[in-house]
């Protein structure tokens, strides 16, 4: 890139393979010290040199308007983000200002140039992209946080989602959403019931309708594999639901009570993790 006769270094670029790809999926990387996040990201990249792109599942930083945290986040992925693309999600922490009040996610929207979604009002909040035989749909689950600034985010996004899915001809349809569709009981808080979150009740019927294959979520800083769910119950014909874990050093040991739909739970206490998503050439 050249600007005012000054240029960046040269970077390699490759196009997707028609059949195979590999992606790294990082859960919430928010931290009070981004050292752990840097170690995890760099180790993941070193162990997976063939990765084509990486995903960060929202709450990239602890405070969305603290530019020191953004500097630390980008420093952690130096050498990675300049050779493979990133698909970021907005989390609720991207909507906080330095007084911990909810505001527009100004920094997040300026840090990343994301595919257009046809909306001027909600530009950058949700989007989709293709990679090889897969269609990825990135949702904005911050409807509560946006309510003071925008009306109709959920309705606009759901209309866009239906049209976006209708137009794709890709074999695999994968949803990425920050807030988790399941609701967990919290230890020592009996008033909170197990079930489905507002996001789950709003989106899971649409995932069933659209024939989504996999749903990745985050927000709870824990890893859970729920298997396939349809019509709010276990069903092999529904999407596979994966709660991705934690990639930063903000951890909630012993907070969540296991859900009846959990099939696999990470060993406790949990440490940092990432996921690898493979599609072979077959």
Where do the model's predicted regions map?
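Short, glycine/acidic-enriched loop or turn micro-motifs at the edges of active sites
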Residues: 31, 62, 143, 181, ...
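Alpha/beta-hydrolase fold active-site loops
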Residues: 21-22, 52, 126, 133-134, ...
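Short acidic, glycine-rich surface-loop motifs adjacent to enzyme active sites
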Residues: 61, 168-189
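Active-site neighborhood of phospho(di)ester-bond hydrolases with catalytic His/Asp-centered motifs
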Residues: 25-27, 53-59, 85-92, 140, ...
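Conserved, compact domain cores that house catalytic/ligand-binding motifs in diverse enzymes
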Residues: 21-95
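Extended active-site neighborhood of metal-dependent phosphoesterases/phosphodiesterases
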Residues: 2-9, 68-169, 189-197, 202, ...
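Glycine-rich phosphate-binding loop signature in dinucleotide/nucleotide-binding domains
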Residues: 44-50, 164-171
């Amino acid at each position: 890139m050249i600007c005012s006769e000054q240029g960046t270094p040269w970077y390699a670029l490759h196009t997707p393979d028609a059949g195979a790809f590999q992606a790294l999926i990082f859960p919430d990387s928010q931290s009070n010290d981004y050292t752990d996040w840097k170690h995890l990201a760099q180790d993941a990249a070193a162990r997976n040199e063939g990765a084509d792109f990486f995903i960060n599942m929202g709450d990239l930083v602890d405070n969305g308007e603290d530019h020191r945290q953004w500097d630390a986040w980008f420093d952690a992925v130096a050498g990675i983000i300049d050779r493979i693309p990133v698909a970021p999600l907005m989390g609720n922490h991207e909507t906080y200002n330095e007084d911990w009040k909810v505001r527009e996610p100004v920094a997040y929207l300026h840090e990343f140039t994301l595919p257009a979604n046809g909306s001027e009002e909600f530009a950058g909040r949700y989007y989709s992209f293709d990679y090889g035989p897969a269609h990825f749909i990135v949702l904005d689950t911050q409807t509560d946080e946006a309510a003071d600034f925008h009306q109709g985010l959920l309705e606009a996004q759901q209309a866009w989602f239906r049209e976006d899915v209708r137009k794709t001809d890709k074999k695999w349809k994968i949803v990425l959403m920050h807030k988790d569709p399941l609701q967990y009981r919290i230890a020592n808080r009996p008033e909170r019931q197990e079930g489905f979150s507002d996001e789950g009740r709003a989106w899971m019927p649409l995932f069933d309708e659209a024939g989504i294959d996999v749903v990745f979520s985050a927000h709870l800083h824990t890893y859970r594999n729920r298997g396939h769910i349809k019509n709010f119950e276990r069903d092999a014909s529904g999407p596979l639901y994966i709660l991705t874990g934690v990639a930063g050093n903000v951890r909630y040991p012993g907070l969540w009570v296991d859900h009846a739909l959990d099939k696999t739970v990470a060993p406790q206490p949990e440490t940092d993790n990432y996921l690898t998503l493979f599609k072979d050439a077959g």
